Regions:
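Fe(II)/2-oxoglutarate oxygenase catalytic core
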Residues: 1-94, 103-163
């Protein structure tokens, strides 16, 4: 996934969302969501823990389950005051994806028949996240850890120096 993000998706998102971390995406979380009789059949309105999200349809043997997308979470009007007419329904097509800002409110309408799988990639920018956490809307208090995290990074701080 890292080469896909670095070589291709970052180029696209850099053009689409330059002011929202699109060109500085440096980490990701990828997972598959499943909808069907033995799983969830819909998904309530929400926003993602990402600067940019890619949602790719992995099959086409289903009906219903459209993705609906609308206003930004950070818009001044409360999401609870939103009306259904403010949202746009997007059909899933095998192998096709939708790229949107993580803060864009969205959900999935009920699946009517079949089983649907989607690859979801949450892409994150430490440049953006180090200034403001997209989930709590506060400046993060970072602690350095090994490995990769959720798009945050902490720089080393000298706590003493020789004079």
């Amino acid at each position: 996934m890292t080469p896909l993000r670095e070589r291709y998706l970052s180029v696209i998102t850099g053009h689409l969302f330059p002011e929202h971390g699109g060109a500085t995406l440096d980490s990701h979380r990828a997972f598959v969501v499943s909808y069907g009789p033995e799983a969830d059949c819909d998904l309530d309105l929400h926003y993602d823990n990402s600067e940019v999200t890619v949602n790719i349809s992995l099959d086409d043997q289903f009906s219903g389950g459209e993705l609906y997308i609308g206003r930004m979470f950070t818009d001044s009007q409360s999401v609870s005051q939103s009306s259904p007419s403010e949202y746009c329904a997007c059909q899933h097509r095998l192998g096709c994806g939708l790229i949107h800002r993580g803060q864009q409110m969205h959900g999935a309408l009920p699946l009517l028949s079949g089983v649907r799988h989607n690859l979801v990639i949450w892409m994150r920018s430490s440049v953006t996240r180090n200034q403001l956490c997209p989930m709590c809307q506060m400046k993060p208090d970072l602690v350095k850890v090994g490995g990769t995290g959720d798009g945050f990074s902490a720089s080393d701080v000298d706590i003493c120096c020789l004079v």
